[in-house]
Amino acid sequence: ASGGTVGXYGAWMRSXSLVSXSTITTFS
C-alpha cells in the first residue's frame, strides 16, 4: 500500500497541494 498506491495517487496528489501534504506524509 506504499508502492502501488503512492504511484497511482501520486498523479492526482501532485495537483492538490493541500491533499498532497496530508496524504504524502501518511503514505511516505
Curated annotation (Swiss-Prot):
It comes from the Bacteria. The keyword Nucleotide-binding does not apply. GO terms for cellular component: extracellular region. One of its GO terms (biological process) is defense response to bacterium. The keyword Cell inner membrane does not apply. Signal peptide: none annotated. Keywords: Antibiotic, Antimicrobial. Antibacterial activity against X.campestris, especially strain G, and P.solacearum PO1. On a 2D-GEL the determined pI of this protein is: 9.12. This is Antibacterial protein LC3. The lineage of its organism: Bacteria, Bacillati, Bacillota, Bacilli, Bacillales.
